[in-house]
Amino acid sequence: MLLTIDVGNTHTVLGLFDGEDIVEHWRISTDARRTADELAVLLQGLMGMHPLLGEELGDGIDGIAICSTVPSVLHELREVTRRYYGDVPAVLVEPGIKTGVPILMDNPKEVGADRIINAVAAVELYGGPAIVVDFGTATTFDAVSARGEYAGGVIAPGIEISVEALGVRGAQLRKIELARPRAVIGKNTVEAMQAGIVYGFAGQVDGVVTRMARELADDPDDVTVIATGGLAPMVLGEASVIDEHEPWLTLIGLRLVYERNISRT
């Protein structure tokens, strides 16, 4: 089986593939302070929950693919693969890795690995032109051209960042539960804040995607818009421009990149 690990700033998502199928997945908090040994213990606990894997770390795993937006965690995971997984082939997404997606940026090395991986999956699953909206710590909008190139994107504050900012900077406001409000017009402070977050972000998505699509394609209707990320369900159904929801887009992209590189490792 292939173990895929997507390390984000707030959460880390792990997926276990049997061929092209995700047979298990986990979401844990990202902690840049964890050592390789601590990560190995954590992985062993998670892997031990699956009936097709053995009790020893690495049993049943025949490949590993990792991308990370946190350099220190990537370093420790590299140590995990070296010390605990032995000869299991591992692909870590870094500059120079073969993705099959040309990056049309002033400095390609600046683009987050997860954003490129999302583009890889978008091209494979839907073709171009496409826009990937990833609802994570930041909300990112990534454009894929009709030729399958990474054409650039937009970075905006994420939903959780906005909620925290309201609670910290608003003298009479507080941190609230992320939930859908009963209506757009809130009848109390919590509902008003929830409405601002949910419908505000839905409006942001519609506005940004509409403008990007006009630049990306001669006919904006040709652009497929894919939503992913842990907080995507908060906005689905309210943002009118979203065509597809693929919660495992990054993990699928990691599988594809692994398959394109393993013969070279």
Swiss-Prot record:
A Gene Ontology cellular-component term: cytoplasm
Protein name: Type III pantothenate kinase
Subunit structure: Homodimer.
Upper taxonomic lineage: Bacteria, Bacillati, Actinomycetota, Actinomycetes, Kitasatosporales
Pfam families: Pan_kinase
Cellular compartments annotated: Cytoplasm
GO biological process entries: coenzyme A biosynthetic process
Source organism per UniProt: Streptomyces avermitilis (strain ATCC 31267 / DSM 46492 / JCM 5070 / NBRC 14893 / NCIMB 12804 / NRRL 8165 / MA-4680)
First-tier enzyme category under EC: transferase
Residue numbers binding K(+): D134
Catalytic activity: (R)-pantothenate + ATP = (R)-4'-phosphopantothenate + ADP + H(+)
SUPFAM superfamilies assigned to the protein according to its UniProt record, in alphabetical order: Actin-like ATPase domain
Cofactor note: A monovalent cation. Ammonium or potassium.
Keywords per UniProt: ATP-binding, Coenzyme A biosynthesis, Cytoplasm, Kinase, Metal-binding, Nucleotide-binding, Potassium, Transferase
NCBIfam families: baf (TIGR00671), PRK13318.1-3 (NF009845), PRK13321.1 (NF009855)
Function: Catalyzes the phosphorylation of pantothenate (Pan), the first step in CoA biosynthesis.
InterPro entries: ATPase_NBD (IPR043129), Type_III_PanK (IPR004619)
Gene: coaX
